[in-house]
Curated annotation (Swiss-Prot):
This is Large ribosomal subunit protein bL32. It holds the Pfam family Ribosomal_L32p. It comes from the Bacteria. The gene is rpmF. Transmembrane segments: none annotated. One of its GO terms (molecular function) is structural constituent of ribosome.
Length: 61
């Protein structure tokens, strides 16, 4: 069975764990509708993506 040869320091452990944090989702304001949406995603309110109509617009309030 694998056993560590020496103890890992707190510094080494914490440096390794520094990449384990969760990233927050980023949102941008759509230029045409003013709605918040994820970058590189369809605006679900208008159905537009990069200036083209992809989906039918929704009328949900």
């Amino acid at each position: 069975m694998a056993v560590p040869k020496s103890k890992k320091s707190k510094s080494r452990t914490r440096m390794r764990r520094s990449h384990d944090r969760l990233a927050m989702n980023t949102y941008i304001e759509d230029a045409t509708s003013g709605e918040l949406r994820r970058p590189h995603h369809i605006d679900l309110k208008t159905g537009m993506y990069r200036g083209k109509q992809i989906l039918e617009p929704t009328d949900d309030i």
